Structures are given as structure tokens and as C-alpha cells.
């Protein structure tokens, strides 16, 4: 019973780690979503100055293999995605507008990225809720196994006490 309780506890701890990682990712996606919404508003109003962004290329292990820059000139109605946003969205297969084969977006083009990030945020929230259900299940198992072990110990103590009194 105690071994089963430990197994349930271990499984619950693993799920709690997964939830913690998902919550960290949710924070990042929320930041990227806020960044995209602000960039959309900025694109609508036109850039107050040149905006140059450096982008990096990565290999399959995530190591930087190169870099390049893109510039949105002052007064234009488009602006660039951040390198962090491009990297995250590429790593997770999220859609963003690729018109012009660059990372510059007009107000309307930002909607694609915003919709994708909103969807990812919702997906992470749903996954976290499911993980919490699993934790509740594992904790129920843990409590049940501990109660069973305590009952067995109590019964053994009663048996030993009876034997001791009988001698």
C-alpha cells in the first residue's frame, strides 16, 4: 500500500512540474500577445522612427547559425515581429503572415499572429486544467493507499496487543 501511495505521489509531482512549465509558457505567450497587440496599434499609427530588428537562424538543436536584419522605415504602416516572437511561433508551428517574405506586418497582418497566439494561450490553459484533474486523481489514490496502509497497521497493532495480553 505504501509503495502504491509513493507511486501516486510521484505521478502527481510529475504533473505538478508539467503544470509549472506550462504556466511559464503561458506567461511568455501572454507577453508575446501583448507585444503583438501593441505592434498592431503602432502599425496603424505609423512608425515614429526607423525600427531595425535582428533575427537569428537556428539549427535543429536551437543553436544560432546566422543572423540578418530587417528595417521598417519611419512613417510606414508596418513594423517587425521581435526575434523572440518569430522563434517561439516557428518552434510551435504557429501561423503568422509571411507576405513579402519578411517579418514586417501591417495592422491587418498582425491579426494572423494575434489569433495564433490567442489559440496557443487557450490550448495551454486547457492542458493545464486537464493536468490538474490528473493531480486530483493521483492525490485521491495516494490518500486511499495511505488510509489502507494505516488500517493495516492499526489491525496489526490490535493483533499484537491481543497476543501480548493473551500471554
Q: Which residue stretches match the model-derived regions?
A:
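Fold-level signal for large, globular catalytic cores of enzyme and receptor domains
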Residues: 75-77, 93, 99-129
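Detector for Asparagine
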Residues: 34, 45-47, 79, 83, ...
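Low-complexity, intrinsically disordered export/secretion signals at extreme N-termini
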Residues: 1-105
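Generic structural signal of hydrophobic/aromatic residues within well-ordered alpha-helices
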Residues: 85, 113, 117, 159-160
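Amphipathic coiled-coil alpha-helices
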Residues: 1, 15, 22, 29, ...
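Proline-poor, low-complexity alpha-helical tail modules
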Residues: 129-167
